[in-house]
């Protein structure tokens, strides 16, 4: 397979991980005599423990969450699902549209792994993300409080009895604004310390000339956090040519329910689903996953034509035979086994292939050109397409009913309905407090409301309506859009500075990603010798991506020179110097 360095990294990682996994699984099986033990893989499928390898385990947990989202969405008639998994230190986002989107090379902790993985985009934003005021901006993440010291409200103290945590975390912000209730936690929360730290942060803003109340400052932190997570979802949807408004937002993870409405509103998504097991949905996903084997065969670099496609018949059949034999050995009959053929294709001279499922009409060229145009916005007329690799995926379909575990979900009723004050959109709102188990099928709850669960809290914003559906799933519908206009001003503030910094930075980073994936130049696609940046109308630097910094000085001079020579630029114009 092409990619010597990636294969070397993968072999090294596997050599470290697999012996440890084998020892652990051997000990586990000794405690479970007579049991059949299957392991979750990063590709989204199960495999017998004896065949499990370390390099296939890297993202197995998050992949199980994506599988759960897909199965739940299909069960309720939603073939397109965005997975939004917000935990303590990070948020994982994914997209499903009838097929799992897989990548075959990724980088984790600086190590390149060549193995099938469900495409999951991870950002450093979670309930533990630190919220600080620095250099005139409100910052959320990427640093995290972790489990020790954790958020300020957890109240962990050192030997002298002093609070370990010094910085606010997103969880503290939600508590301060009333979106979390202390009585819904299994231990006491230190709300007094959170309030004091929030007031001191607002005072820092005032010393910089920004007259923010503690509540406005807190809401600014959430606005920045939500923007980062919404941008991550755009990376796996809009940036790849998909209209995110057509998708269901499947929200899970311990912190996801507090932010689901805000994320949906920013993206224009109309419906949210929160499963009863949302706090542990990855574990649930393992229970409903299929058994999957994936194999590949390097082809070399054959041009895409009828003759070369015909020559692939034998390697495809060999891979299918190997995969079906393995899946049958795990107890599946042929009626429950499905096979799929795929090809890795790319334009000659480029670096990154596109993996395509075999088209129904067999026209790989048209499928490739269409996909390339959707991803990158153009096609290369006259440049030949080459085949790098053929792949086969063999699936043993599970008979597990995704709803069969739900009957075991129990939670205590809170009795008489309560109300609490929640700060939202610049004002305090009286919100209903309900337990999920208090809601009967078909009953509707209009926001603002807090819906409590044993493993999470759901904040229903004004303009959203919540209701219980089949299998105790909670559906949130966006029923009232806010059509108020945003008032822009030339006066900067700590919130807007960070919001626009993230937006412009994202543009520059996307420019670099597309440039690398589509480039023919070795300097660009392998040495990464380039820089991308955004400039204002007079050529001043606005934002740059973390590329080679040496280019940035000359780049600004070049942009200003082009502006001087071409003063009548119009939208859509492109200049090459």
Give residue ranges: language-model regions.
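Glycine-rich phosphate-binding loop of actin/hexokinase-like ATP-binding domains
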Residues: 53-60, 64-175, 261-301
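Hydrophobic pocket-lining residues that define ligand/cofactor binding sites across diverse proteins
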Residues: 32, 73, 237
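A generic local structural motif
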Residues: 44-45, 67-69, 107-108, 234-238, ...
């Amino acid at each position: 397979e092409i990619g010597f360095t990636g294969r070397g990294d993968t072999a090294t990682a596997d050599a470290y991980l697999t012996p440890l996994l084998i020892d652990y699984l051997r000990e586990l099986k000794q405690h479970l005599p007579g049991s059949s033990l299957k392991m979750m893989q990063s590709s989204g499928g199960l495999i017998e423990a004896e065949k499990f390898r370390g390099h296939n385990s890297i993202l197995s947990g998050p992949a199980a969450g994506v599988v759960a989202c897909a199965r739940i969405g299909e069960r309720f008639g939603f073939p397109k699902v965005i997975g939004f998994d917000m935990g303590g230190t990070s948020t994982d986002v994914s997209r499903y549209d009838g097929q799992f989107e897989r990548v075959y090379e990724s980088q984790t902790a600086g190590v390149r792994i060549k193995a099938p993985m469900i495409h999951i985009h991870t950002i450093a934003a979670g309930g533990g993300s630190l919220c600080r005021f620095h250099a005139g901006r409100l910052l959320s993440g990427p640093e995290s409080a972790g489990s020790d010291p954790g958020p300020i409200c957890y109240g962990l103290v050192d030997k002298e009895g002093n609070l370990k945590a010094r910085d606010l975390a997103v969880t503290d912000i939600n508590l301060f604004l009333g979106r979390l209730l202390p009585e819904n936690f299994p231990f006491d929360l230190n709300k007094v310390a959170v309030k004091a730290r929030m007031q001191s942060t607002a005072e820092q803003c005032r010393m910089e000339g920004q007259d923010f109340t503690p509540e406005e400052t807190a809401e600014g932190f959430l606005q920045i956090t939500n923007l980062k997570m919404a941008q991550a979802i755009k990376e796996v949807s809009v940036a790849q040519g998909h209209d995110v408004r057509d998708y269901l937002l499947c929200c899970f993870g311990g912190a996801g329910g507090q932010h689901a409405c805000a994320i949906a509103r920013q993206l224009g998504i109309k419906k949210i689903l929160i499963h009863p097991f949302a706090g542990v949905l990855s574990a649930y996903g393992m229970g409903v996953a299929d058994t999957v084997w994936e194999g590949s065969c390097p082809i070399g670099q054959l041009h895409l034509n009828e003759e070369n496609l015909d020559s692939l018949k034998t390697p495809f059949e060999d891979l299918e035979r190997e995969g079906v034999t393995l899946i049958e050995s795990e107890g599946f009959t042929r009626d429950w086994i499905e096979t799929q053929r795929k090809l890795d294709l790319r334009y000659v001279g480029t670096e990154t292939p596109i993996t395509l499922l075999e088209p129904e009409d067999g026209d790989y060229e048209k499928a490739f050109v269409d996909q390339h145009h959707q991803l990158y916005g153009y096609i290369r007329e006259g440049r030949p397409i080459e085949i790098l690799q053929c792949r086969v995926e063999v699936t043993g379909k599970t008979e597990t009913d995704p709803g069969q575990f739900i009957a075991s979900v129990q939670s205590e009723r809170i009795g008489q309905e309560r109300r609490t004050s929640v700060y939202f959109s610049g004002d305090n709102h009286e919100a209903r407090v309900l337990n999920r188990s208090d809601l009967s099928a078909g009953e509707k709850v209009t926001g603002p409301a807090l819906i409590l669960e044993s493993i999470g809290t759901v904040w229903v914003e004004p303009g959203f309506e919540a209701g219980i559906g089949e299998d105790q799933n909670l559906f949130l519908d966006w029923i009232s859009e806010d059509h108020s206009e945003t008032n822009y001003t030339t006066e900067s503030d700590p919130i807007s500075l960070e919001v626009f910094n993230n937006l412009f930075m994202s543009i520059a980073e996307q420019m670099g990603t597309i440039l690398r994936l589509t480039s023919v130049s070795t300097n660009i696609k392998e040495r990464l010798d380039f820089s991308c940046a955004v400039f204002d109308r007079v050529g001043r630097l606005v934002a740059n991506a973390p590329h080679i910094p040496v280019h940035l000085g000359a780049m600004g001079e070049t942009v200003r020179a082009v502006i001087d020579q071409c003063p009548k630029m119009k939208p859509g114009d492109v200049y090459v110097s």
